[in-house]
């Protein structure tokens, strides 16, 4: 199952859009791409939003039809993650699981916090730097529960099935064995990455502990079930999420004509990034 990207506009601009295509036709990375690449063997599809070591805060947009990847904004300005020493940009390939939804109408019984109204976040820890819009096949290793401004924001830890280390990584304890320090650094990064923007340190549920593969699979199942309710029009409140899709004929927003109306590719050279984004921030007590 091969996916390609359709870029419109220049990276680092408000007009930048990356749509996902299958066989030349636009599909929604939120709704159309299957969660499972191989359900029997528990192999999942991950949509990459942000390549490792980059700063632009790219995300699958919930509001626009066919859910292209765009750069997030705040007060009309493009958002970038700051460099928190010793890290540069995002610490991992960062993306989302399609066909999942962290329901903002439901509080998780253990975190006591409501979902963040997004697809599940995914951290791919393999050796290769991914690209925006790439659809990777991954195996699940564990999960961290970030409490982001009072909302449950799960971070599923995965590795590309084609990574050389993939055969050795089967659960969360294998990560510490083969990639010592990675989980500690991941915890640190998520705790401090908003501090340069004047926000407080993020908190974790479970005292920052990474839960195992089984726990992560349960979270994925719950969020997939929530998504099923969403696209069926049965969610308590859909929060104005665009449900338009081109493959789910039984859903409330099956709309292949919307996909067909997406403009042709028009990639432009990257716009320059303000030099201030290169700055390193040194945060007391982060090491």
Swiss-Prot record:
Enzyme class: hydrolase
Keyword Nucleotidyltransferase attributed: no
Broad class of where this protein is predominantly found: cytoplasm
Residues the record lists as binding diphosphate: 79
GO molecular function: inorganic diphosphate phosphatase activity; magnesium ion binding
Entries under SUPFAM superfamilies matching the protein: Inorganic pyrophosphatase
Subcellular location: Cytoplasm
CDD domains assigned: pyrophosphatase
Annotated Mg(2+) 1 binding sites: 116, 121, 153
Top-level taxon of the source organism: Eukaryota
Enzyme Commission numbers on file: 3.6.1.1
Essential cofactor(s): Mg(2+)
Binding positions (Mg(2+) 2): 121
Listed Pfam families: Pyrophosphatase
Disulfide-linked positions: none
Cellular component GO terms held in the UniProt record: cytoplasm
Protein name: Inorganic pyrophosphatase
Annotated source species: Eremothecium gossypii (strain ATCC 10895 / CBS 109.51 / FGSC 9923 / NRRL Y-1056)
This protein's encoding gene: IPP1
